[in-house]
Amino acid sequence: MLPRLWWLVLWLQPLATLPASAVHDEEAAMSVPRCKSLKETDLIKTSVSDCYCYNQHSQIQWTYMWSTVQVTVTSPGLLNIVYITGSHNCQHTESILSFIKCVTHNFWAPEEAEEITIVFSPYGETVCFSVKPVGRLLPYIVSVSRNIVDFKLFLVFVTGIFLFLYAKTLSQSPVFYYSSGTVLGILMTLVFVLLMAKKHIPKYSTFGALMIGCWFASVYVLCQLMEDLKWLWYGNRMYILGYVVVVGLCSFAACYSHGPLADEGSRDLLMWTLRLFSLALVYTGVAAPQFAYAVLIVLLFSWSLHYLLRAFSYLRWKMRPWFTAEPQVARYLTDDEYREQAEAATARALEELRQACCRPDFPSWLAVSRLQAPKKFAEFVLGASHLSPEEVSTHEKQYGLGGAFLEEQLFSLQTDSLPAS
């Protein structure tokens, strides 16, 4: 049974912007009239703690589906970013998905750093933030740039499309099972260990709580390591390679001992997990939410179209006998029927020939000049038989009972039936 799609109501925002959220953004923007407006290609050098706002574009263009705006704040000293409005302020979010995205971003965003980069969509609500120094205020630089095509967004979008279209195939592939299990063991060891120990956890509620905790802990550790990846690679290259090799081999061995998914329920669970994950990737891989909704609707419709076509094919197969006549069975003629039809066809053709010869436009003299027996032809046109008594007698002797042709056929059959010496 297909699961219900009621969760789309909770996770997807409405296509139109909510009035309450728009009113809140306007009030927040009015409360900070002293904030400086940022534009693309701006480069601001200052030593005063101030706030800045980037006004989003109201007109959406499909050519900027994967474009992002990047604001970089650099200083010799430590800085802190405080969001005033925008999607990073989690007090007035429009949906559960927006709230989770906001909390996740604020949880993993660096609180204090010498260089802070803010990446957001050029469409949507106005983003306002203030720059707060940590300790003594030093000069800092605020630069604004726009990526026409953010390859990270495009890669996330393409990955989501691929996972959605090939979720069923991947869920049944042993290669995908082993490779994804190995990668999961390397990147998220806690989640991998919990999945391997699932049989020893009796309650699903306990397993779900542990899975959520392990998932967020693993993602948090992974994001923290990704920020310092260059430093870790240059200073601890051998340790990183050793960890990848050892944990990768252990993860592959655990997956190999467990074996690929055999029962249909586990495969369906993996397939639906991949599809839900792919929808989340498609939604986050597009800058404008309207384009994301359109792509999600097309994907869901294309997936449902397969089942509609199957139902239509089944109904057509069931209703086909009502509209299709039974095919006629061919029957061979007997010898008597064949002889009767041959005689009737011959008589009809001869009569048509007589009528054609009796027409005024028939070239009678030309026909007579080319015939060997003009008298016989004239008698035939006047109604006599087309065969003379001598011809009938010769035919009976040749093909009748006791004729030469019949005897030849009988002797040839007897010769073929004799065994070869």
From Swiss-Prot:
Keywords: Membrane, Nucleus, Signal, Transmembrane, Transmembrane helix. One of its GO terms (cellular component) is nuclear inner membrane. Pfam families: NEMP (PF10225). It is found in: Nucleus inner membrane. In the ovary, highly expressed in somatic cells. Residues 1-22 form the signal peptide. The chain crosses the membrane at residues 64-84, 147-167, 175-195, 206-226, 238-258, 281-301. It is a multi-pass membrane protein. The keyword Protease does not apply. Coiled coil: none annotated. The keyword Transmembrane helix applies. Belongs to the NEMP family. This is Nuclear envelope integral membrane protein 2. It comes from Mus musculus.
